[in-house]
């Protein structure tokens, strides 16, 4: 028994008073008596005998240098102290984005998501999944389809990067018989390098050749050179792209590449509250980060990706699909459909290696979207757009700071060029209590003097003033 812990008799008395009639967990607290019982049960007399098959050379000679036991209060205090060293995006003005968005999630979302009907460690892929869970998954699919303007959606991917990579391999499977250059896929040069890296990991082992499509100086896709992609299996572009640019020319890209080449578009899902969805201007597959709906940005924690497509790709698309059907009594019923595409059915013929997906997080996204509704989404997108241009106008007035792509249309993000290294500017602003953005030199070495400024619905005039003051103070001191 740990020194200072309550005795078994005390715990049993308290449990009895509370009406508890099960076995108390106190039996699981380590003690020598229980150790002897367990050894006796398996026919051994000592711990050394239990571990006798482990070679002496790999055994630890000294006990682990663990700290002494602590009370619950002490543990919580230590945890708070350690967590206090983290930078909280909500405790200071933050203009950091570059893929994940700071957002407001209504409190009803986590409240509903933590109900026992949803919160489970079990991945819902078996036929006996409850009708309530299946309907919620189907509602998510419906919302995503309406959002991007395409008829088919799955129940989420891991994130935007894996969704993009899976979209490309799916397109090659479907279009290879029609394409004149079936093993080639063209990718915009203004795709975040980490996403391009994931795409390469998915494609290089299956013989798919990636070719890069260049952009003009204003950040728009070079449509003349894009015509060379006609005949390939797919073209992948993003709207907005990695620099936050909304490229109007992309709306004519499908006409340029033709029907034999799949057009895959990565989106900022919130932007679709303002801009026309890609499904309306020829996209065959739409992917994106679902994170702005349902969950805040995480440092390695779970998020989810969206994946929607036309019916042409239905039987070879990745991920779980819920269909609406009729049961034997003629009532509406929901069911997992086309499951033979998935690896838990036929691993060697599966269209994807995704299995344990992001269903719970995706359902949180569906809850968030349902609370917003179409009008709420439009207002949210408008607020973000307004914040983007307000911040842009303010920072470009600072001497020595200029917009990288002047004249373009932007959503959520834009890039500025500085009179010195972006990493120095960020360090200076951090010392002033401002998270000033993302150093684009981390993505492209030639842009080491550029910052990607991210904006969200929570940006205030005070935040903008703090950014201008901090960036202006650094810029004025650069020689």
Residue ranges with predicted function:
Residues 25-38, 42, 46-47, 54-58:
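Compact, charge-rich alpha-helical regulatory domains located at protein termini
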Residues 375-469:
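Conserved C-terminal alpha-helix-loop-beta "cap" of PLP-dependent enzymes
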Residues 125-129, 146-165:
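Short loop-beta-helix segment that forms the pyridoxal 5′-phosphate
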Residues 26, 162-335, 416-419, 423-429, ...:
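Conserved PLP-enzyme active-site core in the AAT-like
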Residues 59-139:
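N-terminal entrance/gating region of PLP-dependent enzymes' catalytic architecture
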Residues 9-24:
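Short, Lys/Arg-enriched N-terminal segments with co-localized hydrophobic residues
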Residues 293-399, 404-407:
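Active-site C-terminal subdomain of aminotransferase-like
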Residues 115-127, 145-150, 180-182, 203-204, ...:
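Gly-rich Lys/Arg/Thr-decorated short loops/hinges at beta-loop-alpha junctions or inter-strand turns
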């Amino acid at each position: 028994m740990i020194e200072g812990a309550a005795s078994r008799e005390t715990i049993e008395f308290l449990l009895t008073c509370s009406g508890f009639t099960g076995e108390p967990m106190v039996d699981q607290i380590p003690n020598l008596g229980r150790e002897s019982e367990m050894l006796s049960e398996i026919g051994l007399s000592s711990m050394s005998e239990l571990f006798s098959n482990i070679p002496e050379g790999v055994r630890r000679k000294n006990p682990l240098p663990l700290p002494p036991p602590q009370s619950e209060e002490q543990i919580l205090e230590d945890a708070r102290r350690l967590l206090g060293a983290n930078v909280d995006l909500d405790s200071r003005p933050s203009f950091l984005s570059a893929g994940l968005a700071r957002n407001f999630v209504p409190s009803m979302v986590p409240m509903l998501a933590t109900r026992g009907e949803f919160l489970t460690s079990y991945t819902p892929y078996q036929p006996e999944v409850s009708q309530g869970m299946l309907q919620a998954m189907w509602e998510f699919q419906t919302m995503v389809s309406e959002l991007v303007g395409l008829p088919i959606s799955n129940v989420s991917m891991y994130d935007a990067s894996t969704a993009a990579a899976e979209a490309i391999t799916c397109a090659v499977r479907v279009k290879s018989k029609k394409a004149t250059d079936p093993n080639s896929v063209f990718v915009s040069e203004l795709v975040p390098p980490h996403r391009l890296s994931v795409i390469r990991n998915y494609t290089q082992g299956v013989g798919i050749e990636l070719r890069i499509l260049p952009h003009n100086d204003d950040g728009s896709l070079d449509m003349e050179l894009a015509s060379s992609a006609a005949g390939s299996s797919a073209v992948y572009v993003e709207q907005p792209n990695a620099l936050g640019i909304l490229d109007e020319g992309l709306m004519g890209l499908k006409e340029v590449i033709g029907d034999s080449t799949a057009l895959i578009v990565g989106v900022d899902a919130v932007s679709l509250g303002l801009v026309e969805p890609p499904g309306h201007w020829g996209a065959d597959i739409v992917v994106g980060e679902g994170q702005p709906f349902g969950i805040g940005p995480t440092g390695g924690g779970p998020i989810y990706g969206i994946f929607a497509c036309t019916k042409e790709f239905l039987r070879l698309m990745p991920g779980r699909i819920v269909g609406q059907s009729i049961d034997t009594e003629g009532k509406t019923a929901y069911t997992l459909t086309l499951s033979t595409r998935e690896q838990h059915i036929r691993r060697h013929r599966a269209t994807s290696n995704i299995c344990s997906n992001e269903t719970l997080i995706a359902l949180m996204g569906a809850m968030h979207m349902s609370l917003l509704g179409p009008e709420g989404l439009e207002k949210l997108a408008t607020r973000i757009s307004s914040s983007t241009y307000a911040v842009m106008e303010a920072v470009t007035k600072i001497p020595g700071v200029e917009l990288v792509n002047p004249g373009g249309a932007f959503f959520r993000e834009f890039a500025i060029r500085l009179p010195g290294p972006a990493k120095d500017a960020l360090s200076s602003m951090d010392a002033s209590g401002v998270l000033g953005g993302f150093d684009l030199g981390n993505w492209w070495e030639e842009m080491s003097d550029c910052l990607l400024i991210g904006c969200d619905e929570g940006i205030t005039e005070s935040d903008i003033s703090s950014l201008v003051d901090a960036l202006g103070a650094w810029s004025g001191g650069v020689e």
